[in-house]
């Protein structure tokens, strides 16, 4: 697990605010050793729970994690964008269209200097070697990104990146060494050209 560091200490020179927009189950956060308010929605069981790199990085910065309660109140998004997967497993979260979820992320981002959202349904589809899951996840992501890009204001930037490949080759269960795109929109458009 990750060792909680407590509240973030303000640095006199930064004054910037970041948000990790993913809303997690309380049980998952507690299994990682992170503080989370509310009752756990389910038992994690005996399986080993590992934190993603994004989770580790955000925790290291002292950020407060969002829970499914935040997703219910429109202050966070489930990892599948819409909430449909969590709802299908019995979670009390709303199901939103990708465009509505994008609007929520845009609103949340405008309250912060940096907003991060992690979508890993394509990774799970790749590990499962499921073309059906891959196509559905990519269609949902496409609708979400189209709305995000359309909703960018003149001072907004959006960077879309992946940490590795795998959904592009469903003959493998593992990550690939294929080049991954880094896309920039709005103010970020000219800043990602040099990324190789």
Predicted regions and their residues:
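His/Asp/Glu-rich, glycine-adjacent segments
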Residues: 1-113, 119-125
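Substrate-binding rim/cap in mid-to-C-terminal beta-strand-loop elements of soluble/periplasmic
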Residues: 174-196
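Basic/polar, cationic surfaces and motifs that engage anionic cell-wall
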Residues: 149, 169-171
């Amino acid at each position: 697990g990750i060792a909680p560091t407590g509240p973030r200490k303000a640095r006199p020179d930064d004054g910037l605010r970041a948000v990790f927009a993913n809303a997690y189950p309380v049980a998952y956060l507690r299994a990682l050793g992170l503080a989370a308010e509310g009752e756990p929605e389910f038992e994690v069981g005996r399986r080993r729970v590992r934190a993603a790199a994004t989770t580790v990085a955000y925790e290291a910065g002292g950020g407060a994690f969002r829970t499914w309660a935040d997703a219910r109140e429109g202050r966070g998004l489930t990892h599948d964008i819409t909430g449909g997967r969590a709802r299908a497993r019995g979670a009390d979260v709303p199901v939103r269209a990708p465009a509505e979820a994008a609007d929520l992320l845009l609103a949340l981002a405008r309250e912060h200097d940096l907003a991060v959202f992690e979508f890993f349904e394509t990774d799970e589809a790749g590990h499962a070697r499921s073309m059906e899951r891959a196509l559905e996840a990519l269609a949902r992501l496409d609708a979400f990104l189209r709305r995000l890009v359309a909703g960018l204001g003149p001072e907004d930037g959006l960077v879309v990146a992946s940490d590795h490949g795998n959904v592009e080759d469903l003959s493998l269960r593992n990550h690939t060494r294929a080049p991954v795109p880094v896309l920039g929109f709005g103010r970020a458009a000219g800043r990602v050209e040099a990324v190789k």
